[in-house]
């Protein structure tokens, strides 16, 4: 979970990961 991820769709926020301080959506 990328706690710093704001906005985007629910799937991105829930399944995404943090890379270099940015939210990367899960596949």
From Swiss-Prot:
<feature type="disulfide bond">
    <location>
        <begin position="2"/>
        <end position="23"/>
    </location>
</feature>
<keyword id="KW-1015">Disulfide bond</keyword>
<feature type="disulfide bond">
    <location>
        <begin position="12"/>
        <end position="25"/>
    </location>
</feature>
<feature type="disulfide bond">
    <location>
        <begin position="5"/>
        <end position="18"/>
    </location>
</feature>
<protein>
    <recommendedName>
        <fullName>Peptide Cn29</fullName>
    </recommendedName>
</protein>
<keyword id="KW-0964">Secreted</keyword>
<dbReference type="GO" id="GO:0005576">
    <property type="term" value="C:extracellular region"/>
</dbReference>
């Amino acid at each position: 979970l990328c706690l710093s991820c704001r906005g985007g769709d629910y799937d991105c926020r829930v399944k995404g990961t943090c890379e270099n301080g940015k939210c990367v959506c899960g596949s």
